[in-house]
């Protein structure tokens, strides 16, 4: 099965080797037929502590690293 890749914004870098990334998705509301925005936060592994708050990044699914971390940061987006 291919690994999922998501794009999001770093919202916290206070943990060692971990960043919290907010990923936003948009969908049409089934009744109102209006575009709705929902976001979810993922903890991602950042081996070199190189990403800072506000950076746009891509995260990739991986094997569990800890209780909450199942994603790793692949690259920064411009």
Curated annotation (Swiss-Prot):
GO biological process: one example: translation
A GO cellular component entry from the record: cytosolic small ribosomal subunit
GO molecular function: rRNA binding; structural constituent of ribosome
The entry's keywords: Ribonucleoprotein, Ribosomal protein, RNA-binding, rRNA-binding
Pfam families: Ribosomal_S17
Source taxon at top rank: Bacteria
SUPFAM superfamilies referenced in this protein's UniProt entry, alphabetically: Nucleic acid-binding proteins
Similarity comment text for this entry: Belongs to the universal ribosomal protein uS17 family.
Subunit details: Part of the 30S ribosomal subunit.
PANTHER family: 40S RIBOSOMAL PROTEIN S11 FAMILY MEMBER (PTHR10744), SMALL RIBOSOMAL SUBUNIT PROTEIN US17M (PTHR10744:SF1)
Function, in words: One of the primary rRNA binding proteins, it binds specifically to the 5'-end of 16S ribosomal RNA.
The protein's name: Small ribosomal subunit protein uS17
Gene name, Swiss-Prot/TrEMBL: rpsQ
């Amino acid at each position: 099965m291919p690994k999922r890749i998501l794009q999001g914004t770093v919202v916290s870098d206070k943990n060692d080797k971990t960043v919290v990334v907010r990923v936003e998705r948009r969908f049409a509301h089934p009744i109102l037929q209006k575009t709705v925005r929902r976001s979810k936060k993922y903890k991602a592994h950042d081996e070199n502590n190189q990403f800072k708050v506000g950076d746009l990044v891509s995260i990739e699914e991986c094997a569990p690293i800890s209780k909450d971390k199942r994603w790793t940061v692949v690259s920064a987006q411009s």
